[in-house]
Amino acid sequence: LLAVQGPKAEEIVLRLTGPELGELRYYRVAHVEVLGTTAYAARTGYTGEDGFELFVPAELGPALWDALMAAGSDDGLVPVGLAARDTLRLEAGMPLYGNELSLETTPFDVGSARLVKPKDGGCVGGDALAAAAEEPHDFLVGLHIDGRRPARTGYEVRSDGWVVGVVTSGAPSPTLGQNIAIARLDHTPTIGGTVEVDIRGTETSATVVELPFYRRPH
């Protein structure tokens, strides 16, 4: 699997696959001909940007890599790893399994209640979800962190000396030019309010903001 993400992703990928792939909608998959073989192309990614993920036989991977880099050489295409991907998904406010999501997390804890309708029936775990919908739940918020030290996963969030939540993801944001974090709070957040994050024993002020931090222009 090779992913091409960013505002010029479509233009670059279509140079290898042909124009028909440009009609593929987000979260859809199609067969494409690339480098003389049939592959899968999905209009997916976890960066908050437009892009494609290309699924090819393993032995074709190096050739596809070289072809993509050549196709995007004039458009600033550069190779990046998971750290860059994770920073982009953080800026886009996208929850990640192992950070914001777990086996114990419900859709109501992460602002995804719109994705489930347990009362309509036909849903695996529907009864449990319906019960969870009536119970108190956590809230995901964004934090603008003051100072130069970033908040990391697991750092406590406090208000008036009380622990009210935990940082689930945090990193410096190249787009915003400051440290940001996603936190799970145990109460309804006040957007624009302030909390303190325990960063290695030092309480650091942070401003509560709505997610996402960044939304790509359409």
Regions found by a protein language model. Name each.
Residues 1-218:
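Conserved, structured C-terminal
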